[in-house]
């Protein structure tokens, strides 16, 4: 299985990089994991609604340029579907069983994702209504992907 995580913005914090690298290493026995960073759109602190949409549109174009037609795409969104870890593990297993070997996860920038990115999604995925920095979300997501593979392998990692 090939897993791609497309994220907006560059990760600067060493502690996030180290955590993500650790899970990427652990996942290597189950899947090839690629993390693709696209530049975030520089914008002033206070934006009008139209300016916010323009920022999301530009970031969305960068995101969409990294997604191939054959990929099954999860977009992380507050309004997406929440899942338990076991349910997510079953979904990933079923995707592989039914021929989806290329799975992409999208983490938008601080304003979220554009309508075009959300329309491209096969599924909108929510980790709940909490607001988290998108840098932290990368670590949370890759840990949950690892947890899903461990659940599917029968490992005691998930208790």
From Swiss-Prot:
It comes from the Bacteria. One of its GO terms (molecular function) is rRNA (pseudouridine-N3-)-methyltransferase activity. Coiled coil: none annotated. Disulfide bonds: none annotated. Keywords: Cytoplasm, Methyltransferase, rRNA processing, S-adenosyl-L-methionine, Transferase. Its main location: cytoplasm. Signal peptide: none annotated. Its EC number is 2.1.1.177. One of its GO terms (cellular component) is cytoplasm. InterPro entries: Alpha/beta_knot_MTases, RlmH-like, tRNA_m1G_MTases_N. Transmembrane segments: none annotated. It catalyses: pseudouridine(1915) in 23S rRNA + S-adenosyl-L-methionine = N(3)-methylpseudouridine(1915) in 23S rRNA + S-adenosyl-L-homocysteine + H(+). It is found in: Cytoplasm. S-adenosyl-L-methionine binds at residues 76, 108, 127-132. Homodimer. Belongs to the RNA methyltransferase RlmH family. PANTHER family: METHYLTRANSFERASE, RIBOSOMAL RNA LARGE SUBUNIT METHYLTRANSFERASE H. HAMAP family: 23SrRNA_methyltr_H. Specifically methylates the pseudouridine at position 1915 (m3Psi1915) in 23S rRNA. This is Ribosomal RNA large subunit methyltransferase H. It comes from Lactobacillus delbrueckii subsp. bulgaricus (strain ATCC 11842 / DSM 20081 / BCRC 10696 / JCM 1002 / NBRC 13953 / NCIMB 11778 / NCTC 12712 / WDCM 00102 / Lb 14). The lineage of its organism: Bacteria, Bacillati, Bacillota, Bacilli, Lactobacillales. The gene is rlmH.
């Amino acid at each position: 299985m090939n897993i791609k995580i497309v994220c907006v913005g560059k990760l600067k914090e060493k502690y996030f990089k180290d955590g993500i690298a650790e899970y990427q290493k652990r996942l290597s026995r189950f899947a090839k994991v690629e993390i693709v960073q696209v530049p975030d759109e520089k914008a002033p602190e206070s934006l009008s609604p139209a300016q916010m949409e323009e920022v999301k549109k530009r970031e969305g174009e960068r995101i969409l340029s990294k997604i191939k037609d054959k990929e099954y795409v999860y977009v992380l969104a507050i309004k997406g579907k929440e899942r338990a870890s076991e349910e997510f593990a079953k979904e990933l297993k079923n995707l592989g069983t039914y021929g989806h070997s290329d799975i992409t996860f999208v983490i938008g920038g601080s304003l979220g994702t554009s309508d075009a990115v959300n329309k491209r999604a096969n599924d909108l995925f929510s980790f709940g209504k909490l607001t988290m920095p998108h840098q932290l979300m990368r670590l949370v997501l890759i840990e949950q992907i690892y947890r899903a593979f461990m659940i599917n392998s029968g490992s005691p990692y998930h208790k």
